[in-house]
């Protein structure tokens, strides 16, 4: 009896070449459904349509095609079990030896919707639901379960290795190969189901507590090492459809490292605060996950030069993120400093040519610098902690000006700039700014006044007339008094201390503007 292959694919990549080999080299009989059968027929190959094979037409607009005993009996039958073989014979069912199925493009559909912008959420959800595959998962799960007798391919990238396996095995596949294929199926299904559950949760905006946490990724790249050379590391992308950094285009430079990716993500979060079209050109320079220079300017070059001047020592070997396309003038200046990575939404061809002078410099283009993970996860002994990403930014209209001195429009704009930056500095975090440029950054100190001192010391005399932002409230008035002594004229902080009145009184005494946002931005 000839061997039977069942093919039903959404992604037709490599399909014809595979079918040709199956028929011409290994004598398979092909059974196929819908568009897959049409593609095979157009290639001049013999193929039996599923509806003809089962004797049942496709119904419900194609929703039911392969859910039939002749299909699933053929897949699930254990050839080594006499009773299964007898059932096949009595029901005129032939055993299926190969299942080639890839799933409806659910992830691609929702990614396309996000890229195009969703104007009708209900219709978008309905369109996404139509891409939830039923027959495909059923077939590949059945084949994976019966991998002792059936080979299953759920990804076109497997076709070449399968044909090599047939060649070396004289037309047969080995058990280890089939086991690996079965594992691939269950990994794919876990990823697929997770994408569906995540999208439904977001689309339905459920407020119910999430009782299960599913973390599943597809290995994109084995990294040279982790934070340190003795630590192994792998880069996983969220799904089979590349998004975020997995979708970024690396124009040049060495392979990305673990630390590069961690710092790039931190840089993306900072620059995302300044991604609106009306925002001035903005540049953020980061080192070890903390901003060391953030600035805005009339041009991208001016913004970069201001950010670099904010702390040129720390910028050495840093990460640079920009909210505008890299232009030639900026590229020429970028090459004068040793940098690890640069990321921007675009890079002009002439600028890319200039940057090639630094062959090791990693230059990445990520058009969408705004979209990031909705949830952040940290591993702890015995489990994980998950929280909503800190995407809140309290607008000036919701601030409370708690001092007698009131801010000017220019001070409000400066306070907003400082507030956007301090949100992305490790706690306890203090940022001193002026002219939409960071002058001093106090990060990661165990007491707040310690971070104040570091930021002010770094700013030096430039702190005169500057603005100070704090990610958390001031427990005492010492930070306010220290800031005033350095020449700070406006402060922004969350408020919420039982001693807020002491800080307010000190600010009034010293003639400082102070705004409370009501929102804390701890970052650990």
From Swiss-Prot:
UniProt keyword list: Hydrolase, Multifunctional enzyme, Purine biosynthesis, Transferase
E.C. number(s) listed in UniProt: 2.1.2.3, 3.5.4.10
Gene source species: Acaryochloris marina (strain MBIC 11017)
GO CC terms: cytosol
Pfam families assigned to the protein according to its UniProt record, in alphabetical order: AICARFT_IMPCHas, MGS
PANTHER family in the record: BIFUNCTIONAL PURINE BIOSYNTHESIS PROTEIN ATIC, BIFUNCTIONAL PURINE BIOSYNTHESIS PROTEIN PURH
UniProt similarity note: Belongs to the PurH family.
SUPFAM superfamilies: Cytidine deaminase-like (SSF53927), Methylglyoxal synthase-like (SSF52335)
Protein known as: Bifunctional purine biosynthesis protein PurH
Catalytic activity: (6R)-10-formyltetrahydrofolate + 5-amino-1-(5-phospho-beta-D-ribosyl)imidazole-4-carboxamide = 5-formamido-1-(5-phospho-D-ribosyl)imidazole-4-carboxamide + (6S)-5,6,7,8-tetrahydrofolate; IMP + H2O = 5-formamido-1-(5-phospho-D-ribosyl)imidazole-4-carboxamide
Record-linked PROSITE patterns: MGS
MGS-like domain ranges (all copies): 1-154
A biological process from GO: 'de novo' IMP biosynthetic process
InterPro entries listed in its UniProt record: AICAR_Tfase_dup_dom_sf, Cytidine_deaminase-like, MGS-like_dom, MGS-like_dom_sf, PurH-like
Any GO MF annotation of the entry: IMP cyclohydrolase activity
Domain notes per entry: The IMP cyclohydrolase activity resides in the N-terminal region.
Pathway: Purine metabolism; IMP biosynthesis via de novo pathway; 5-formamido-1-(5-phospho-D-ribosyl)imidazole-4-carboxamide from 5-amino-1-(5-phospho-D-ribosyl)imidazole-4-carboxamide (10-formyl THF route): step 1/1; Purine metabolism; IMP biosynthesis via de novo pathway; IMP from 5-formamido-1-(5-phospho-D-ribosyl)imidazole-4-carboxamide: step 1/1
């Amino acid at each position: 009896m000839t061997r039977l292959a069942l093919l039903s694919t959404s992604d037709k990549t490599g399909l014809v070449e595979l079918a040709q080999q199956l028929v011409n080299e290994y004598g398979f009989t092909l059974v196929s459904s819908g568009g897959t059968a049409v593609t095979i027929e157009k290639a001049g190959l013999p193929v039996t349509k599923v509806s003809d094979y089962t004797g049942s037409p496709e119904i419900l607009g194609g929703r039911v095609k392969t859910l039939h005993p002749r299909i699933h009996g053929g897949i699930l039958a254990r050839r080594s079990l006499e009773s299964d073989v007898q059932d096949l014979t009595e029901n005129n069912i032939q055993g299926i030896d190969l299942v080639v199925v890839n799933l409806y493009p659910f992830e691609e559909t929702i990614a396309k919707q996000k890229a195009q912008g969703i104007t009708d959420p209900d219709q978008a959800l309905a369109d996404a639901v139509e891409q939830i595959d039923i027959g495909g998962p059923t077939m590949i799960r059945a084949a994976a379960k019966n991998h002792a007798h059936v080979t299953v391919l759920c990804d076109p990238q497997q076709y070449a290795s399968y044909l090599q396996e047939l060649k070396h095995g004289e037309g047969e596949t080995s058990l280890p190969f089939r086991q690996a294929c079965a594992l691939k199926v269950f990994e794919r299904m876990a990823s697929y189901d997770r994408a569906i559950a995540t999208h439904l949760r977001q689309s339905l905006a459920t407020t119910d507590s999430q009782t299960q946490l599913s973390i599943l990724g597809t290995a994109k790249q084995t990294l040279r090492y982790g934070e340190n050379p003795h630590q192994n590391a792998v880069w996983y992308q969220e799904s089979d459809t590349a998004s975020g950094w997995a979708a970024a285009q690396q124009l040049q430079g060495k392979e990305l490292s673990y630390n590069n990716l961690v710092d790039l993500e931190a840089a993306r979060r900072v620059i995302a605060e300044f991604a609106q079209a009306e925002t001035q050109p903005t540049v953020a320079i980061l080192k070890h996950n903390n901003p060391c220079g953030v600035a805005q300017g009339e041009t991208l070059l001016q913004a970069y030069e201001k950010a670099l001047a904010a702390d040129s020592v720390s910028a050495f070997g840093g990460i640079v993120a920009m909210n505008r396309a890299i232009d030639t003038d900026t590229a020429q200046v970028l090459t004068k400093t040793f940098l690890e990575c640069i990321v921007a939404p675009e890079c002009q061809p002439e600028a890319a040519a200039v940057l090639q002078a630094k062959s090791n410099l990693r230059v990445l283009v990520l058009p969408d610098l705004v979209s990031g993970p909705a949830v952040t996860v940290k591993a702890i002994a015995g489990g994980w902690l998950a929280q909503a990403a800190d995407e809140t930014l309290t607008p000036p209209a919701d601030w409370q000006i708690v001092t007698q001195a009131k801010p000017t429009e220019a001070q409000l704009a400066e306070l907003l700039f400082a507030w956007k930056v301090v949100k992305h500095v490790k706690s306890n975090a203090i940022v001193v700014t002026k002219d939409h440029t960071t002058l001093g950054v106090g990060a990661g100190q165990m007491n707040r006044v310690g971070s104040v001192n570091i930021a002010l010391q770094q700013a030096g005399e430039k702190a005169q007339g500057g603005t100070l932002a704090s990610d958390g409230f001031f427990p005492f008035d010492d930070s306010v008094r220290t800031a005033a002594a350095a020449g700070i004229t406006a402060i922004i902080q969350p408020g919420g201390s039982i001693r807020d009145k002491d800080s307010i009184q000190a600010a009034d005494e010293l003639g400082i503007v102070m705004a409370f946002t009501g929102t804390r931005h701890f970052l650990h």
